[in-house]
Amino acid sequence: MRDNSTFIQGLRSLGMDLNKHQLEQFEIYYDLLIEWNSFMNLTAITEYEEVIQKHFLDSLSLIKSYQIKTGDTLLDMGTGAGFPGIPLKIAYPDLNVLLMDSLNKRINFLNEVINRLELKNISAMHGRAEEQARKLDFREKFDIVVSRAVARTASLAELCLPYVKKGGYFIPYKSGKVTEELEEAEYALECLGGKLEEKVTFSLPDTDMERTLICIKKVKETPKSYPRAGGKPLKMPLIRKK
């Protein structure tokens, strides 16, 4: 077993405490990440301590803006190597998780992690956000949708809010200051049925990396015309014309 003192200290700074089995699951996850990263592009961060800080603890920092409840349904949009969805599932075993990504080879990796960690009530799905949001099985079905994908908040809101049930939350993870980006996203939130509740800015434990969690509540149903097809949410985000 590796020296997890940095991880344990970081968890405590988040008000969390994991048992031995959960810590072992994170170690296996790391080993699989490095193994698969040798033949496919999953992460540029490979040192154990750095993965702990910039992937594991960053993923778990969700608790700074949202208190996970037993039986919550969570969608991780554009999950990539499984962040933040898999760390959240390890820490909260009762969480129901769907990981979605547009690259099928990543889904193979995610399924391997799910199987090796013997995680239940979690699945990985290959698909594009614009297409899957049209399906009744997914539209407005989740208590919380999260994303660490690098895109403007207005774009992410159009891709993610259609999946959030009324009264639920969409929470994107962002780097640094987001004031201008949030001002830009105001019109998109109006169109999509979202309302900004708060933004929480903090530094990751033992780093000077500034992160912001944007807590957007779903206050009304998203019109059926969203998300727009053909890559429009990313190419032409919903921004108020001046």
Swiss-Prot record:
Gene3D superfamilies per record: Vaccinia Virus protein VP39 (3.40.50.150)
Which residues span the membrane? none
Keyword Cytoplasm annotated: yes
Tell me its EC number(s), please.
2.1.1.-
Molecular function as annotated in GO: rRNA (guanine-N7-)-methyltransferase activity
Which InterPro entries does UniProt cross-reference here?
rRNA_ssu_MeTfrase_G (IPR003682), SAM-dependent_MTases_sf (IPR029063)
UniProt KW keywords: Cytoplasm, Methyltransferase, rRNA processing, S-adenosyl-L-methionine, Transferase
Summarize where S-adenosyl-L-methionine binds, as residue positions: G78, F83, A129, E130, R148
Q: Where does it reside?
A: Cytoplasm
Query: Which GO cellular component terms are attached?
Result: cytosol
Pfam families, A to Z? GidB
Q: Which residues form the signal peptide?
A: none
The record's listing under SUPFAM superfamilies reads: S-adenosyl-L-methionine-dependent methyltransferases
Coiled-coil segments on the chain, per record:
none
The reply on keyword Transferase is yes
Q: What does this protein do?
A: Specifically methylates the N7 position of a guanine in 16S rRNA.
Family listed: Belongs to the methyltransferase superfamily. RNA methyltransferase RsmG family.
Q: Which protein, by its recorded name, is this?
A: Ribosomal RNA small subunit methyltransferase G
Q: Which organism is it from?
A: Lachnoclostridium phytofermentans (strain ATCC 700394 / DSM 18823 / ISDg)
Lineage, opening ranks? Bacteria, Bacillati, Bacillota, Clostridia, Lachnospirales
Q: Which gene encodes it?
A: rsmG
